[in-house]
């Protein structure tokens, strides 16, 4: 079992990042929040890990904070919520805002996550509401639940940009390489424009 990995950030894809350690590139699935906290390519990063093993799959899931890792594991404890759904939930807002939504029974916020329907949202609220501590959140953090979090669409924007570049005839590898050098806080349109400038050099 792995506790964490410390290595060089080497790239980002639709739902994972690549971390190099001792000349080995590790594919680590993660959330939009963690993706938004990645440093420049080549810089060092530390991710807290959870390994998932099934008959047909072995995968590493990593996060920049222990808090997000613990929330990921808590979500996995719910029947019907797998790793993909948990990452989707952790990509729509900060961990604190997600906790606040659960404690307040805010189904609307939770169903913003792709792949999360009303019944699943209700199950999440029912099973986790009493496990979360209200005193861990400030009123300011709670108020943010009504707004748009800066990272809420981060993962979605990356996916859309990659898809657009591939639709223009570039391979996934080419698109990813260009996108690694582009500011991920830009809009989809501007990320595409900046990526194309790099690809057409």
From Swiss-Prot:
Family indicated by similarity: Belongs to the RuvA family.
Q: Which InterPro entries match?
A: DNA_helicase_Holl-junc_RuvA_I (IPR013849), Hlx-hairpin-Hlx_DNA-bd_motif (IPR003583), NA-bd_OB-fold (IPR012340), RuvA (IPR000085), RuvA_2-like (IPR010994), RuvA_C (IPR011114), RuvA_C_sf (IPR036267)
What residue spans carry the region label Flexible linker?
144-152
Primary location group: cytoplasm
Q: Name one Pfam family in it.
A: RuvA_N
Q: Where in the cell is it found?
A: Cytoplasm
Q: What remark about domains does the record contain? A: Has three domains with a flexible linker between the domains II and III and assumes an 'L' shape. Domain III is highly mobile and contacts RuvB.
GO biological process, any: DNA repair
Under the heading SUPFAM superfamilies, the entry gives: DNA helicase RuvA subunit, C-terminal domain, Nucleic acid-binding proteins, RuvA domain 2-like
* HAMAP family attached to this UniProt entry: DNA_HJ_migration_RuvA (MF_00031)
Protein name, entry field: Holliday junction branch migration complex subunit RuvA
The cross-references to NCBIfam families, in alphabetical order and at most eight, read:
ruvA
Query: What organism is the protein native to?
Result: Clostridium perfringens (strain 13 / Type A)
Keywords for the protein's UniProt record, in alphabetical order: Cytoplasm, DNA damage, DNA recombination, DNA repair, DNA-binding
**Record's function text:** The RuvA-RuvB-RuvC complex processes Holliday junction (HJ) DNA during genetic recombination and DNA repair, while the RuvA-RuvB complex plays an important role in the rescue of blocked DNA replication forks via replication fork reversal (RFR). RuvA specifically binds to HJ cruciform DNA, conferring on it an open structure. The RuvB hexamer acts as an ATP-dependent pump, pulling dsDNA into and through the RuvAB complex. HJ branch migration allows RuvC to scan DNA until it finds its consensus sequence, where it cleaves and resolves the cruciform DNA.
| Renumbered residue ranges of the record's region Domain III | 153-201
Q: Name one GO molecular function term.
A: ATP binding
Could you name the Gene Ontology cellular component terms for this entry? cytoplasm; Holliday junction helicase complex; Holliday junction resolvase complex
Subunit text: Homotetramer. Forms an RuvA(8)-RuvB(12)-Holliday junction (HJ) complex. HJ DNA is sandwiched between 2 RuvA tetramers; dsDNA enters through RuvA and exits via RuvB. An RuvB hexamer assembles on each DNA strand where it exits the tetramer. Each RuvB hexamer is contacted by two RuvA subunits (via domain III) on 2 adjacent RuvB subunits; this complex drives branch migration. In the full resolvosome a probable DNA-RuvA(4)-RuvB(12)-RuvC(2) complex forms which resolves the HJ.
Chain segments carrying region Domain I: 1-64
Q: Residue ranges of region Domain II?
A: 65-143
């Amino acid at each position: 079992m792995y506790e964490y990995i410390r290595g060089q950030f080497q790239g980002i894809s639709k739902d994972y990042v690549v971390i190099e350690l001792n000349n080995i590139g590790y594919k680590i699935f993660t959330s939009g929040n963690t993706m938004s906290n990645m440093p420049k390519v080549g810089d060092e990063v530390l991710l807290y890990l959870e390994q998932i093993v099934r008959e047909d799959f072995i995968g590493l899931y990593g996060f920049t904070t222990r808090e997000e890792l613990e929330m990921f594991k808590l979500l996995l404890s719910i029947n019907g919520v797998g790793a993909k759904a948990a990452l989707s939930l952790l990509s729509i807002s900060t961990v604190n805002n997600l906790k606040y939504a659960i404690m307040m029974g805010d189904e609307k916020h939770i169903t913003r996550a792709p792949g999360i329907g009303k019944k699943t949202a209700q199950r999440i609220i029912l099973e986790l509401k009493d496990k979360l501590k209200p005193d861990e959140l400030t009123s300011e953090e709670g108020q943010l639940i009504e707004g748009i979090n800066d990272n809420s669409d981060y993962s979605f924007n990356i996916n859309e940009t990659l898809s657009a570049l591939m639709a223009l005839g570039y391979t996934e590898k080419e698109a990813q390489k260009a996108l690694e050098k582009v500011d991920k806080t830009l809009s989809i349109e501007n990320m595409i424009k900046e990526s194309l400038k790099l690809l057409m050099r």
